[in-house]
């Protein structure tokens, strides 16, 4: 957080935690969903993507308890399975605000051609569909318009975000969702430390 200067931006994308949580709602821990190429998306085709649920939580709250929802993702483009953790963006908003970041305002969004500081890839795709035939946007989106059904399913599980750094100081400690912020920060720090150890392995 402290490596970003005031006036700088923190930009990224990931699977949307709550969207993925709902996607896997009826899946047991250790099981998952698999997508194959081809029109019928059946197992006779080549596996292009797979998600395996590695948690057994039954709900996702907007606090530090939502940071340990592990999933394993297989992606055919790299032919590898890797561990990810669901991002609860409503909780991330709270964390970012606490550390001096805010979402972009309407003028800032207008300058970069976006409607939201955080939104789904489905929204971006729908916006692209309205723009793709305009002269200004001609050729701008490459092959995005011709995504397959499976590629859309994967893509629409993702969210983009843009936060702007507006101050260095951290907000005072207060109670949020029944949990002391200091305790919240400690638990978050412990999770990150354990995640670093797991990455080293």
Residue ranges and their predicted role:
Residues 3, 24-25:
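Short acidic, glycine/serine/threonine-rich loops at helix termini
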């Amino acid at each position: 957080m402290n490596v970003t200067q005031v006036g700088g931006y923190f930009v990224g994308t990931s699977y949307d935690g709550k969207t993925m949580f709902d996607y896997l709602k009826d899946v047991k821990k250790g099981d998952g969903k698999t997508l194959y190429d081809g029109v019928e998306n059946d197992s006779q085709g080549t596996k292009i993507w797979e998600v395996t649920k590695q948690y057994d939580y039954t709900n996702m709250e907007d606090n530090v308890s939502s940071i340990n929802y592990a999933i394993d993702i297989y992606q055919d483009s790299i032919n590898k399975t890797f561990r990810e953790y669901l991002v609860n963006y409503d909780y991330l908003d709270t964390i970012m605000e606490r550390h001096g970041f805010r979402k972009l305002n309407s003028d800032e969004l207008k300058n970069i051609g976006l409607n939201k500081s955080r939104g789904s890839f489905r929204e971006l795709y729908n916006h692209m569909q309205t723009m793709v035939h305009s002269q200004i946007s001609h050729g701008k989106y490459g092959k995005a318009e011709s995504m397959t059904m499976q590629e859309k399913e994967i893509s629409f599980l993702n969210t983009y975000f843009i936060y702007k750094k507006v101050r260095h100081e951290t907000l005072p400690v207060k109670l949020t969702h029944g949990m002391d912020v200091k305790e919240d920060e400690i638990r978050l720090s412990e999770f990150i430390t354990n995640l670093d150890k797991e990455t080293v392995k």
